């Protein structure tokens, strides 16, 4: 039955055979299109048509990610063996050399030898060696951070997107899907693009989560691996508020015992861990790092990706949507099918009268419709090809965008790491320089102490020499006294011999007295005439007393000399040990300073090597990125140019991409302008700071110059005063010389008197011997007197018997002869006694005269000693004044050293500001950078010339002071008595110390010149580095890093 329009129902249209011999696919697609022309989008027929295609696409896409997930699981959970090649965090290649537990942290660890020197050790940690490798190529990591293949950017999501697009193309060519309305083509295409970009971004974020540090992510969970303070790694065990402080805190169990607690603070436990492994830190100081061993964030992200892919594959027939868009683009310029049918129906109604003509016209129209349907199928196939090509191009563009973003992120991350390394090296360099300065100060202090100890040692040596000289003099005097004692002993022995001879003579006299009685009366008369024996002389007692005093004084001097010698020997030993200790410490500190210098040099070389490596890597990344962009342009230019419409659509797409790129470039340019403005402000601020520092430095230099001039004038006045004092000392020294001559004359007189005293003592000894002999002779005279009385009695008896006995006349004559002889001997003895008395009186008179002379000389000696004491006091005062002048000169040299150190410190701060200015100038545009560089060079030359002039002036002043000091020292040497070696040694030590101070000041001036030259070389090097950095386009990450540091 026919409709009122005269056409057959659409259900029978499928019975016509294809006149061109189309395949079944074309007929099926035509029947579907014919059936959908009269039905709506939400009809059951439409749902049946779209259902199989979507389910098939979903099945195709959902079956693909299975092997990929299994492969990734094997990479993370597979068993690693020693010698296997792996990648640490997916970016650092190396070979496994150790698997197992370690002593520095609990759990399982993997030791890897990296290909590049970007590690942390040489296989040994904490003094324990686990494997052997070169320095900075060994690293210890968790096995969960190792992969058997390098991690590529956006690998998983790109695979899903490619598979989904493949499924769409298959469904498009199969023709099983029904296209929806044309009004949904543009937003669905945008959704496809957004989904592809989103998956690319998710893949990039997944890579960054697995292989690098996420800076802005503060969503921390229990079990996440984090980095605390930029140096300490660990696992999150607690997140929330605490009792010991306000705000959000994060409790971390560290990998190494570098913490402060065991999870409990102030009696409250927040988590459990070993001691020294727990650490609490604010959340803003904690950064989450990749490969969390127990973190659920990875599972959530993979689940979210899987849901995104499944949603994309299960969406209502994305292939049919693309086919509908192509149909809409091809049918938009020609009449629709419904209009064509109405036209044929109107023609058929006008010619209804002729059935034959109508049937022919109907056949023609039917053929025309079939021809149009065939053309429509061909165009649809071509549009499907074009859309697939566009999808591929969009996919490639998305991949290139993701790769570009990944390259930019990696470059920024590497640059940030390089900056952190440079900053750490700078800090270490500053710390090492500070330590070097401290060690240098310590060494200078030790040198000063060693010099002082050497000076004191010289003084002690001079004192010991003086004491030795005194000991020698005392020994000589002792030898003289011993010689005198021996001489006195010999004289005593001689006197004893003389007394023995006298005794023999007395015995002979007794025999003669017994023989001759006649001499008894004469001897008695002589004895009566001789007076009583004289008393003992006081001169002998005085001489004995003086001798005892001399002996006691010699003993005391000997005892004091021995005590002083022992004391000074002990002090000399102690000072020698202290000097040895100081010398050993000085050598030790010198060795430590040399080691620190070597470490600083090694750190600087390693820093430069790392900077060169990072620059080469950045250059290679930039060249690879440029090559990829050129390849993309080549592929876009070399596409198929069969039809004008496809080229137009591609051009429109490219124009849209160009517009997006222009918008991004505009945003980047605005951002760059903002950063350049900020850098300009920073540069202005740095210039102002530099100008202020320069003004301050100029003021300080002027102040130091004035202070130096004042000190120089003060030193000149002090030197003038010292010269006046030296003149006074010269005059006093002349007086001392005159007094010394007088003292020497008095000493000679005293020696002469001592000799006379010794002679008088000898004579007194002789006198004593004579007195003893006289006493003995008196005793003998007494005995003779008794005998004489006996003889007188006998004579009286003889006289009474004279008359009776005449026979005895002859005997009496004999007795008279004997008495005559006895009288003669007694007279001889009396003469001898008179002579001895005269000699004794003469000797006593001489002793009195000598005593008077000795007392006068003693008075003169006392007055001379008083003068000598006063002159010695004056000499000590002059020496103290000279020592004060030398101390002032030493203090002036110390102030010069301090001023030179201050100059070095100010120059160091000025160089730091200049480095900051150079870094700021490096990011400025070309002409402005050149202009600032020229200005900086000119300022640098001016400052360098000023520093050289200052150094030259300081050297001239130092040489002038050295000359004045040498003149004053020469004058001082001319004024001082050459016979005083301690003063000469002391002044020589002072001269050596002042020369050392001047030499140190000159060395420091040379060091300042070397620093100026080194800073000039550093400025040239930084300029070349800034030129290379600006040529490679690295300044934008530097600015971003600076802004992050400011925030």
UniProtKB/Swiss-Prot annotation:
Indicate the segments annotated as coiled coil, or none if absent.
355-525, 564-637, 677-1017
- Subcellular locations according to the entry: Cytoplasm; Cytoplasm, Cytoskeleton
Q: Where is the composition biased (Basic and acidic residues)?
A: 1036-1047
**Signal peptide stretch:** none
GO MF, any single term: microtubule binding
Residues of the region (Disordered) are 1-71, 144-164, 196-216, 314-340, 1022-1047
Bias (Low complexity) occurs at 17-39, 49-62, 315-339
Sites of the modification Phosphoserine? 50, 203, 208, 212, 315, 924, 974, 980
Residue ranges of domain CAP-Gly in the record = 100-142, 240-282
Which key words tag this protein in UniProt? Coiled coil, Cytoplasm, Cytoskeleton, Microtubule, Phosphoprotein, Repeat
Quote the biased-composition stretches of kind Polar residues, using this chain's numbering.
196-211, 1022-1033
Q: In which tissues is it expressed?
A: Expressed in the brain, and very low levels in kidneys.
Q: Which Pfam families match?
A: CAP_GLY
Gene Ontology terms: cellular component: cytoplasm; microtubule cytoskeleton; microtubule plus-end
Stated role: Seems to link microtubules to dendritic lamellar body (DLB), a membranous organelle predominantly present in bulbous dendritic appendages of neurons linked by dendrodendritic gap junctions. May operate in the control of brain-specific organelle translocations.
The record's subunit annotation is: Interacts with CLASP1 and CLASP2. Binds preferentially to tyrosinated microtubules, and only marginally to detyrosinated microtubules.
Q: What is the recorded name of this protein?
A: CAP-Gly domain-containing linker protein 2
Gene from which this protein is expressed: Clip2
């Amino acid at each position: 039955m026919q409709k009122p329009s005269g056409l057959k129902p659409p259900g029978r249209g499928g019975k016509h055979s294809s006149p061109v011999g189309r395949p079944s696919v074309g007929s099926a697609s035509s029947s579907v299109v014919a059936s959908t022309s009269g039905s709506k989008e939400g009809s059951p027929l439409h749902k049946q048509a779209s259902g199989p295609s979507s389910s098939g696409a979903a099945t195709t896409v959902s079956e693909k990610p299975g092997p990929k997930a299994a492969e990734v699981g094997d990479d993370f959970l597979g068993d690693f063996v020693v010698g296997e090649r792996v990648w640490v965090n997916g970016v650092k290649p190396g070979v496994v050399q150790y698997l197992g537990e370690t002593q520095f942290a609990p759990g399982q660890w993997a030791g890897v030898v990296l290909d590049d020197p970007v590690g942390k050790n040489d296989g040994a940690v904490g003094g324990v060696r686990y494997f052997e490798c070169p320095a900075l190529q060994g690293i210890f990591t968790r096995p969960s951070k190792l992969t058997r293949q390098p991690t590529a950017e956006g690998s998983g999501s790109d695979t899903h997107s490619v598979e989904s697009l493949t499924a769409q193309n298959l469904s498009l060519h199969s023709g099983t899907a029904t296209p929806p309305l044309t009004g949904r083509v543009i937003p669905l295409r945008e959704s496809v693009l957004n989904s592809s970009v989103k998956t690319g971004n998710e893949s990039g974020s997944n890579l960054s989560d697995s292989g690098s540090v996420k800076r802005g992510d503060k969503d921390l969970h229990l079990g996440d691996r984090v980095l605390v303070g930029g140096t300490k790694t660990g696992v999150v065990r607690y997140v929330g508020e605490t009792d010991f402080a306000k705000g959000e805190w994060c409790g971390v169990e560290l990998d190494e015992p570098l913490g402060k607690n065991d999870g409990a603070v102030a009696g409250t436990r927040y988590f459990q861990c070993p001691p020294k492994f727990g650490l609490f830190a604010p959340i803003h100081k904690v950064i989450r790092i990749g490969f969390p061993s127990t973190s659920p964030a990875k599972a959530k992200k993979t689940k979210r990706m899987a849901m995104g892919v499944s949603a994309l594959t299960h969406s209502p027939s994305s292939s049919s949507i693309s086919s509908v868009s192509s149909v809409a683009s091809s049918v938009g310029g020609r009449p629709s099918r419904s209009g064509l049918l109405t036209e044929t129906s109107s023609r058929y109604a006008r010619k209804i009268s002729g059935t034959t003509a109508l049937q022919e016209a109907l056949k023609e129209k039917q053929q025309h419709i079939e021809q149009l349907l065939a053309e429509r199928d061909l165009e649809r196939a071509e549009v499907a090809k074009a859309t697939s090509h566009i999808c591929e191009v969009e996919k490639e563009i998305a991949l290139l965008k993701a790769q570009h973003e990944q390259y930019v992120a990696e470059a920024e991350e590497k640059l940030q790491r390089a900056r952190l390394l440079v900053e750490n090296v700078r800090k270490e360099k500053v710390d090492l320089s500070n330590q070097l300065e401290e060690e240098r100060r310590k060494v200078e202090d030790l040198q000063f102490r060693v010099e002082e100890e050497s000076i004191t040692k010289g003084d002690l040596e001079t004192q010991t020499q003086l004491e030795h000289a005194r000991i020698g003099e005392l020994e000589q005097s002792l030898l003289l006294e011993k010689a005198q004692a021996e001489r006195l002993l010999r004289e005593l022995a001689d006197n004893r011999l003389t007394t023995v001879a006298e005794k023999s003579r007395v015995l002979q006299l007794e025999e003669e007295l017994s023989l001759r009685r006649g001499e008894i009366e004469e001897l008695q008369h002589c004895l009566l005439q001789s007076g009583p024996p004289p008393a003992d002389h006081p001169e002998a007692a005085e001489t004995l007393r003086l001798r005892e005093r001399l002996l006691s004084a010699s003993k005391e001097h000997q005892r004091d000399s021995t005590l002083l010698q022992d004391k000074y020997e002990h002090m000399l030993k102690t000072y020698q040990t202290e000097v040895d200790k100081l010398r050993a410490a000085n050598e030790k500190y010198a060795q430590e300073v040399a080691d620190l210098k070597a470490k600083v040099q090694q750190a600087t070389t390693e820093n430069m090597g790392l900077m060169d490596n990072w620059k080469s890597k950045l250059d290679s990344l930039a060249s690879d990125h440029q090559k990829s962009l050129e390849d993309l342009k080549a592929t876009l230019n070399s596409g198929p140019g069969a039809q004008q419409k496809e080229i137009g659509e591609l051009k429109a797409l490219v124009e849209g991409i160009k517009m997006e790129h222009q918008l991004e470039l505009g945003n980047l340019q605005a951002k760059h302008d903002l950063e350049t403005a900020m850098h300009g402000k920073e540069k202005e601020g740095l210039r102002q700071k530099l100008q202020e520092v320069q003004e301050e430095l100029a003021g300080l230099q002027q102040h130091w110059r004035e202070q130096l001039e004042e000190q120089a004038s003060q030193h000149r006045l002090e030197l003038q005063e010292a010269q006046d004092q030296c003149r006074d000392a010269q005059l006093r020294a002349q007086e001392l010389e005159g007094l010394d001559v007088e003292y020497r004359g008095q000493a000679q007189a005293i020696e002469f008197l001592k000799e006379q005293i010794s002679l008088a003592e000898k004579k007194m000894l002789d006198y004593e011997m004579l007195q003893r002999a006289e006493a003995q002779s008196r005793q003998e005279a007494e005995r003779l007197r008794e005998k004489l009385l006996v003889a007188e009695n006998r004579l009286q008896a003889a006289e009474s018997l004279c008359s009776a006995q005449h026979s005895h006349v002859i005997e009496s004559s004999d007795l008279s002869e004997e008495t005559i002889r006895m009288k003669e001997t007694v007279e001889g003895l009396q003469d001898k006694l008179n002579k001895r008395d005269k000699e004794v009186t003469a000797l006593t008179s001489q002793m009195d005269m000598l005593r008077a002379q000795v007392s006068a000389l003693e008075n003169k000696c006392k007055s001379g000693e008083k003068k000598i004491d006063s002159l010695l006091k004056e000499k000590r005062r002059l020496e103290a004044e000279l020592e004060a002048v030398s101390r002032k000169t030493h203090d002036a040299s110390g102030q010069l050293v301090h001023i030179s150190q201050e100059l070095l410190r100010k120059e160091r701060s000025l160089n730091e500001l200049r480095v900051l200015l150079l870094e700021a100038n490096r990011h400025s545009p070309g002409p402005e950078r050149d202009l600032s560089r020229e200005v900086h060079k000119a300022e640098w030359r001016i400052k360098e010339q000023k520093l050289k002039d200052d150094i030259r002036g300081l050297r001239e002043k130092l040489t002038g002071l050295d000359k004045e000091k040498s003149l004053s020292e020469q004058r001082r040497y001319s004024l001082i008595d050459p016979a005083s070696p301690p003063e000469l040694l002391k002044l020589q030590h002072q001269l050596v110390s002042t020369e050392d101070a001047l030499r140190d000041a000159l060395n420091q001036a040379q060091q300042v010149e070397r620093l100026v030259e080194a800073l000039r070389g550093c400025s040239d090097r930084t300029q070349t580095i800034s030129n290379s950095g600006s040529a490679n386009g690295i300044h934008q990450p530097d600015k971003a890093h600076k802004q992050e540091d400011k925030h």
